[in-house]
Amino acid sequence: MLDVNAFDKLKIGLATADDIRGWSYGEVKKPETINYRTLKPEKDGLFGEQIFGPTRDWECACGKYKRVRFKGIVCERCGVEVTRSRVRRERMGHIELAAPVTHIWFFKGVPSRLGYLLGIAPKELEKVIYFASYMVTSVDEEQRHQDLPDLQDEFDHEVQNLERRRNNEIEERAKKLEADLAELEADGEVKGSAKTKLRNGAERDMAAIRQRYDDQIKRIAAVFDKFKSLKPGDMESDVDLWREMEDRYGDYFEGCMGAEAIKKRLQDFDLEAAAKELREEIETGTGQRKARALKRLKVVNAFLTTDNKPEAMVLDVIPVIPPDLRPMVQLDGGRFATSDLNDLYRRVINRNNRLKRLIELGAPEIMLNNEKRMLQEAVDSLFDNGRRGRPVTGASNRPLKSLSDMLKGKQGRFRQNLLGKRVDYSGRSVIVVGPSLRMHQCGLPKPMALELFKPFVIKRLVDLNYAQNMKSAKRLVDRGDSEVWGVLEEVISEHPVLLNRAPTLHRLGIQAFEPILVEGKAIHLPPLACAAFNADFDGDQMAVHLPLSAEAQAEARSLMMASDNILKPADGHTVTMPSQDMILGLYYLSTVIDGAKGQGRIFSSLEEAQMALDKHEIDMQAKVLIRLPQDFVLPKDWEPGEVQVIDPEPGSPDVVKEERFADGSVLFATSLGRILFNDTLPVDYPFINEQAPKGKLSKIVDDIATRYSTQQVAATLDALKDLGFTRAPWSGVTMAFSDIVAPPDREEIIKGYEAQAAKVNNQYDLGLLTEEERRQELINLWTECTDKVAEAMRENFHDDNNVNIMVQSGARGNWMQIRQIAGMRGLVANPKGEIIPRPVKSNYREGLSVLEYFISQHGARKGLADTALRTAESGYLTRRLVDVSQEIIVREEDCGTTHGLPMTVAERDENGNLVLVKAADGGPYSRLLAQDVLDPADGKTVLYHAGDALSMDVLNDLVAHGVEQVIGRSVLTCESKRGVCAKCYGWSLATNKLVDVGEAVGIVAAQSIGEPGTQLTLRSFHSGGVASASDITQGLPRVTELFEARTPKGEAPISEFAGTIKVQDTERGREVILQPDDDSLEPITYQVTRRAPMLVKDGQHVDPGTQLVEGSVDPKKILRILGPRAAQMNIVNEVHDVYRSQGVDIHDKHIEVIVHQMLRRVTVIDSGDTDLLPGELVDRARFREQNKKTVAAGGRPAAGRPELMGITKASLATDSWLSAASFQETTRVLTEAALNEKEDDLKGLKENVIIGKLIPAGTGLARYRNATVEPDKAIRDTIYPNFGLGDGSLGGDLSDGDLGDVDFSNIDFGDLKLGDDFNPDDFLDDNDNPVDFGDEFRIDPDELK
């Protein structure tokens, strides 16, 4: 087989008949598959062993040669080569067709490539191919021109002859009439009626004679006229006329029906002349003609610039794919199940053989044509069943799967087998929580671990002499002997495994853990990893994968460990957060209760306080004063305060004060719980002396993540988790029915609002309010009522109420849910998303009435249906995003651009002070500066230089200096030829360091946008009747609309030019008229609805691109009026707004990566002196390069306009045909690629996955492939703590004397596996001679004695 690393490009083209014969190992002549008695393949049939190879390894068909020693021999009896049976997966055969057939992809595809090339309408082409029309293939112009005068004379002569004969016959008939009349008169009967009858009969006969001869003359005139103007490519569907022409003038032209005619035309087709003619037509033509000429020129050009031959679109030979790819298997009842392809091939072979026989018998043309048409149809259905006419069906009327269907869709070859392979060394099981596991550990069930690590265990058993060979070791493992488990423990230690939970929506869906063996059959997952996987323990399952090679293990350990993946790549916030019980425990510890037992007592040390707690002298939540040492880190901005003493001793003060002593120690007021809580945080972290609900905890963890190494953050999180779980039961928080307290004045509040509602209804009845106004009034009333009840309810909850603690701490639930249980349910929406003006006054604690239940359920069920739809919709969006951006990889450190985007860092608050912008962490944060930032105070001092990173600290500093805007580098302004550069991308949000070269930022971006897609609503809930909100698409459909660059629903117009606005109302609505400043331009009228809120006033002056009314703007128009940068920024901001409105944080840089791909192409308007074609879509980089070359050679560059493409279109327009074909419209993409002989240079990820190469991203890049793995300092310090050696550096001032008293001879180094990595070849040079290490490594033989 071909080695995937042996090539770096993949080209697709049209195969000629010789190519197909070259691939083939023999011709398939019979339609038979296997013999039903012997179950052996039939000779020369579709499964023949002579063609495709033996069905059994190293055995020929007749059994003469068996065993591997006859390898390569071809049996003289049965003609089968002795080889492995797997060649039946790769050897092809072929069928020699008795008549040529066209390839349906090139004839029936849209547009029809054959039709474009020959300049024939597809309908006409179809008539020729399916034997309904004749086609002229060649005309002997010269001979015809020479003989035309003679032929004209001949024709005139024949016409005269016919006219003469006609006149003669008519004359004879007239004479006969006269004779008949005379006879009548002679008989004496002179009745008028008899004469009339005779005359009428004679006239009828003469008219018939005249008609007959006229038809003949007309016929030969038509034949002659047709012949005179005959040219190749002419068609004739009148069979009689064609035959007449063939009989008379057959020497001067040739023509036929079917694919044969097409083939002859293609062989004689002059591409150069056609291209020249089309170019002229493009220059002179207009409108439709020009457009068609452009399209035709593309096809003609494709053949001119490649090695493809046009006649290869017509097949004389068709390939037969290897039999193991279209297998036939025996079922239980002796019946056979077979691949549909075998039926389709069988039809082709049957019809082909019948046609051969008819040709040999010399059958008449009509029979041959019919058989040829059937053969064409059989080949069509083999290649693409159902593309033309009714599909061929199998049993139970199911259309058969053709070769095209094998490639297409989710179940096709591309997506099912090439992009979605099954993986060995993997298992799956249900997950349960492992509260005692560290963040980097997972529990693996013993049986699963044994199966996964089997090869490793077997090798180790043999190494340790528990078994003599692998076979007996395997038996030991299968029996599960006691020594096996010990070896398994040893094998799995420090061998990470990967855990994956479907759906893998972002890269945190697969992480590495160190396995710990556990009993049972469930995988144990550390609770802190749940958020990243979006896992819970209600029956979720997870898959385990085993990295095998040392490189894979190193990669898993250094890049994928769960303890290293603490930040979310979408926004840079911590994804690993304490939750639920942990929060409850930590909240309990950090709460101080006023008046708790022991408040105000003073302790001389922490130990003393702990002792008092153990003796129940003080409460854990009591505020006490403890003297703490000088290295204690006080809270930020600490000022000494005072504490009230509870039950003071007689004569002692009732207030005690905090103070700092001369020795640096400090008397500090806090609770013992808070000290325990702070013990888990890093030693030098400022003391947190306040209550820590979820929000506060989140801030603390985020802060620690920015200040400390990942290892320290992971350790802190683990400590917080342990403390939280340990202390949660201490808090005694449980939930009972009695904890849900309804507010006592609930009924009163509701009664008051009922009276107001009655008043509103009364006004409606009197006609004072419209239906819409009443509805809005009621909605406002009941919303106010619900809020009042909720407020009363919150005030009624006591601080130590269990439900209150859960909500306040952020452990579970929110006030809205509690309001529905204890307060009132309030207003609900119907399935349309409109609010029903009748409120649900009951709550769930007391139960709903029937009517209330019904109106509640309606919207609730709709919600569930919506969620299911949303998941699918969001998954499809992610798939398109990944496809469009998968080739964006950080390719270089710096592209050298000086451009960037203006970014706002500060805004004014309501008091007019400068504050950091709200979306700073999703905009300027984590980018590098493109230009120096000057101090606004003097305009000279450089605060930060170009290339500095904008961390949160830097941003705050800029705001403090009064800087409002900076120029930051962005993916949109990056000038890398392929992908993007690290400096334009900025920090990787998952590490808070500059992104590494090789990072697949495109896929990270797609996942970051797609992953929260399910959280976006499918439709906006609107409070019925508010026009502005309801007309604008929101949520997921809005994101799709933006990324697909569609014209938005409810589009808002923008001004085309600078000018003055005039607003006037008309009968139909409202008109906004723009009077341009430039008088040469006509005024423009925009029709808008009266409901749409205006953004401009009558008489206002506007700039180009100003939005006139509220609504969504069409990005294509922004591109046209304001240019590409404005269009890009519009899409980025709009997408960001949709996510922000749903409370989802995504960094703008991810959206920019996608938008960068949407504007990658340029439409050529004028090709200048380049090789580009007008109207062609080309990559911006290629466009620039072509122009550079042309200008350098002194030519005229091409002109083009940037093209905004939706993500689906952009994916299909990618340079990689493998990637495009595996996305959508597979057959169309492959047709196009084959015609243009496209080369895929395998630069993206998909194409490499498809052919089975390492992806060119991450550690797959050449620059990382030869790297050596060493632990970094932080890890080294945690593995090898300094054992008091000198100054703390490892082996600081270590001298021989320090170890003088160590007896090395008695130390057992057994477990250290010293010398495992020792390779004797390291001491040999390239020619296998010992390496000379120079003098310092020379050993004097005397020293060894």
From Swiss-Prot:
Transmembrane portions of the chain: none
Composition skew (Basic and acidic residues), residue ranges: 1335-1345
EC number assigned by the record: 2.7.7.6
Top EC class, one word: transferase
Binding site for Zn(2+) 1: 60, 62, 75, 78
CDD domains tied to this protein: RNAP_beta'_C (cd02655), RNAP_beta'_N (cd01609)
Function in brief: DNA-dependent RNA polymerase catalyzes the transcription of DNA into RNA using the four ribonucleoside triphosphates as substrates.
Family assignment from sequence similarity: Belongs to the RNA polymerase beta' chain family.
Protein name according to UniProt: DNA-directed RNA polymerase subunit beta'
